[in-house]
């Protein structure tokens, strides 16, 4: 199915020249003279490279043959991440470059979406919100009551996020994996 220029948005998956891409950033430009166009940064699912591409009015791109499968993250064994299909129990391995930034949010046993392109695993998407335990953060000090103040906190996966001063080591918090921002404590 063809995708028109007006349908482009961040996160959309497209195919150009037989290669699947994800739109990382886009900007709709209306110059004083001439036709409007979209300037986009797109990231290849196959090699991870980001390129800049300009789409003009009337340009079309194809929707890639991508299938999302729910899988369980099992473990990381040095150079590969192991996943198991929760329906067939088949296991697959993905490299560090294929997993990318998702690795800092993954816990053993977590369900993730593995993206398949022509039946080959190429990428992993974690849930937009995850609950993780804080393993290290600075202690509270009397007087740290400003809600605008933040401190770094290391999570059980190794990711570091900024949290309010009232959040303590050992607590479980919810984090937005796209913006890498603290959302709230888990009750």
UniProtKB/Swiss-Prot annotation:
Record's keyword terms, sorted: Cytoplasm, Elongation factor, Protein biosynthesis
GO cellular component, one term: cytoplasm
Record InterPro entries: Elong-fact-P_C, NA-bd_OB-fold, Rib_uL2_dom2, Transl_elong_fac_P/YeiP, Transl_elong_KOW-like, Transl_elong_P/YeiP_cen, Transl_elong_P/YeiP_CS, Transl_elongation_fac_P
GO biological process: peptide biosynthetic process
Compartments where found: Cytoplasm
Pathway as given in its UniProt record: Protein biosynthesis; polypeptide chain elongation
Molecular functions (GO terms): translation elongation factor activity
Principal location class: cytoplasm
Superkingdom field: Bacteria
Secretion signal span: none
PANTHER family, A to Z: ELONGATION FACTOR P, ELONGATION FACTOR P (EF-P) FAMILY PROTEIN
Free-text function comment from the UniProt entry: Involved in peptide bond synthesis. Stimulates efficient translation and peptide-bond synthesis on native or reconstituted 70S ribosomes in vitro. Probably functions indirectly by altering the affinity of the ribosome for aminoacyl-tRNA, thus increasing their reactivity as acceptors for peptidyl transferase.
NCBIfam families according to UniProt: efp, PRK00529.1
Record family assignment: Belongs to the elongation factor P family.
Protein name per its UniProtKB record: Elongation factor P
């Amino acid at each position: 199915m063809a995708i028109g220029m007006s349908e482009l948005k961040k996160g959309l998956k497209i195919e150009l020249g037989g290669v699947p891409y994800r739109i990382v950033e886009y900007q709709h430009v209306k110059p004083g003279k001439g036709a409007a166009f979209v300037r986009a940064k797109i990231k290849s699912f196959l090699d991870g490279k980001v390129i800049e591409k300009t789409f003009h009015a009337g340009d079309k791109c194809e929707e890639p043959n991508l299938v999302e499968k729910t899988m369980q993250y099992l473990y990381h064994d040095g150079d590969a991440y192991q996943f198991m299909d929760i329906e067939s129990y088949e296991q697959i391995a993905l490299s560090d470059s294929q997993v990318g930034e998702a690795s800092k949010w993954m816990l053993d046993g977590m369900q993730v979406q593995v993206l398949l392109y022509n039946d080959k695993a190429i990428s992993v998407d974690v849930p937009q919100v995850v609950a993780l335990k804080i393993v290290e953060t600075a202690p509270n000090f009397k007087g740290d009551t400003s809600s605008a103040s933040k401190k770094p906190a290391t999570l059980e996966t190794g990711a570091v996020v900024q949290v309010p001063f009232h959040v303590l080591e050992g607590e479980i918090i919810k984090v937005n994996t796209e913006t890498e921002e603290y959302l709230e404590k888990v009750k």
